[in-house]
Amino acid sequence: QFENKSTLFLIAGITIYYACSCIVFNKVYEASDNIIDELFHVPQGIAYCKRNFSYWNNKITTLPGLYLISSIIGLSEDYCSTYYLRLVNLIASGLNLLLFVTILRNIYGNQFKILLLGFNLALLPPLYFFSFLYYTETLSLLSILAFSICTLFKKNYFLIFVCGVCSVVLRQTNIVWIGMVFGHTMLNLILKSSLANQSVLLLLGSFIGFVVWNGSIVVGDKEAHVATLHIPQMFYFLLFYGVFSLPHVLNTTLSTLKTMFNNKIKVILYLMLFLTIVHYNTVEHPYLLADNRHYTFYIWNRWFGKYDFAKYASVPAYVFLLFNLYDNLKDQNCITFLLPYTLCTFVALSLQKMIEVRYFLIPYVILRMRFARPSTKLVVTEFIWYFLLNYVTFYVFFNKQFMWKDFDYPQRIIW
């Protein structure tokens, strides 16, 4: 009986999610022309939608997965427009919600609060915002979730391979998360089938061959995305965790402070290590300093870039958040997860010179689904927190406008 009620709640919840999101979607469409990278993505998507596969904008640095999906919806040229291209991501966001709940039920069991937790992940402010734009983030995450479910439930090895290929074609760096899932499942001996193992190994090997052939993980504008050792990206990810897991951070603050007090030597060593890293390895990308359409621009220019001491003053927060994160993982912090996850997060983030909130989405979602079993009160608090952040985000987007000399329409601020 609970199973039936749970399914009905899920269907009702997804219906409400789409109904509310469609209202926001139409307002975003009416209020904006191409948003930042959509300047490249939308014309490329329209070209593929119209079956013009010879057109390619060299400013694009990802493989054409997003645009190939656009070619599928282009059964009629009437659908080859910004509206319908963006709509694909909105539909995908609802599928993400469904997969969130599926995975969380497997981890925590079938409880009502798990449904709400799935909605919280779908409403994660940066992820939710990009569900209304023609960016790769939503579909990229969908492909990773689908791949994870296929391995989790030991689906057909060919299906695992197909999901993995789709994931990489949508975003090359997804190969890192495929490697993480593979590493985790191998360490746990979940994948019993040698064929399943071979399917992932074949995918990993094929991707390595592509990188060698291409000379880079990036296609298109390689100069803007040169691999650079940038370890502080891990610290910025901790700040991302601190903001979007604030209810969980506050809930375990006393426990974390007690742990730090009992491990003073370890805390001092972390402080010394982190101070050394930020001193010698803080990197500024030219785009970060020049593009005032992202929140990271304002954070950097009003704190990190404005005061010489800021990068050092932030180190205690990094150390606290690291201990706090470990505290929130608790019984989920097994070595079979933490080892491949930490290595893959380092590879995915610390070779990126540019600080982009989008880069933190997949590692955060993976981590968030491993938190210790939350209370209903905590899940509800998180929902309220995300609602407030989303409200502020869209308020700024709709009301804060400014002109750039190279554009004849107003620019807006996004994540």
Regions found by a protein language model. Give the residues of each.
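Membrane-lumen/periplasm interface segments of specific transmembrane helices
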Residues: 167-299, 305, 390-403
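Start-transfer (signal-anchor) and selected internal transmembrane alpha helices
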Residues: 1-25, 266-268, 333
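Signature aromatic-anchored transmembrane alpha helix within multi-pass, membrane-resident enzymes
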Residues: 10, 14, 264-276, 338-345, ...
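Membrane-interface alpha helices of multi-pass inner-membrane proteins
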Residues: 117-119, 126, 145-151, 157-172, ...
